[in-house]
Every structure is written in structure tokens, then in C-alpha cells.
UniProtKB/Swiss-Prot annotation:
It is found in: Cytoplasm. This is Adenine phosphoribosyltransferase. GO terms for biological process: adenine salvage; AMP salvage; purine ribonucleoside salvage. The keyword Lyase does not apply. The keyword Transferase applies. Pathway: Purine metabolism; AMP biosynthesis via salvage pathway; AMP from adenine: step 1/1. GO terms for molecular function: adenine phosphoribosyltransferase activity. Its main location: cytoplasm. It comes from Pasteurella multocida (strain Pm70). HAMAP family: Aden_phosphoribosyltr. Homodimer. InterPro entries: Ade_phspho_trans (IPR005764), Adenine_PRTase (IPR050120), PRibTrfase_dom (IPR000836), PRTase-like (IPR029057).
Amino acid sequence: MNDKLALIKSSIKSIPNHPKEGIIFRDITSLLEVPAAFQTVVDLFVTRYKEKGITKVLGTESRGFIFGAPVALALNVPFVLVRKPGKLPRETISQTYQLEYGQDTLEIHTDAIHAQDKVLIIDDLLATGGTVEATVKLVQRLGGDVQDAAFVINLPDLGGEARLNALGIDAYTLVDFAGH
């Protein structure tokens, strides 16, 4: 692991038994408290995508906003929000997806993505891939083309990367953590 990735990984605190027994919560808020680590995340994403022809960066509620917005600014492209129901003021479409116990729904403005758009999805963490799969479906329903999905953290034991690959989308992740 190079020094940049080591800085990122060491800045992420692991909180055992949160939000429930047996789960280790990977806390990116501790990374945000280390400006050099936060800047490194943004810089690594920008370096990877600056020559890829991305036309929109999309962030998923809510921690995807933290990393997606500065990347969009650096790439000089619009930043698009994907939110929980009822949070976006203009006309939206929604996509429901399954959780371990139940389901959730995401929404996007219908005029945010167009047929020619090459979209980069950014979120903080890739676990099972359910949230990002729903986000991909929203983009595709609006005619956009998801080029890639980028995450600060990957939990490879939960299978999210394979789920994205099955959709024909590469996952770019900076650091891996074992377990849940």
C-alpha cells in the first residue's frame, strides 16, 4: 500500500458493534477531520477521471455528496444528487431496492441526466452494492451511461464489487476493510 492509501486507511476509524452487535462501522467522518486525507481522496478520484470524458458526477445520499461535489468541481462538470424520497423539489423518478431486512428507495431529478451523459457515481462505501445498483438503474432509465463507480472504502467480503461487475460497471475503490 502506498503512502497516500495508507494515510486514507489510517484516518478511517473502525467502531465495533455499531450500529448493531457484530458490525464494525467504518467511520469516514474521522477521515474528514484529517484535511490531508480528505484532499488525497479527492485528488486520487480527480486524477483517475480527469481524462475519461465524464460529463456528470453523481453522489448518493448522503456521504456520496461529501466526496462527489469536490470531484465534480475539480472536473468542471455538474454534480447531481441522488436522494431519499421527498427531498428533491423538481420532478423525480424513483428506484426501490432491497435491503437485508426490508427495502429503500432513491430518487433523482428527471432533468438531471441526459442521453449523452457519461456518469461517474461516487459514494463513501461499497458493501453489498444495493444502493449503487439502484443508482445505476436510475441513470440508465434517464438514458445516461454509467462509466464507473468510485468509493473510498470497499468491504469485499459483502460482494458489492461483483454485483457491479455483473452490471458491466467497474468499481474503483481506494481502501479495503475485511468483514462487515
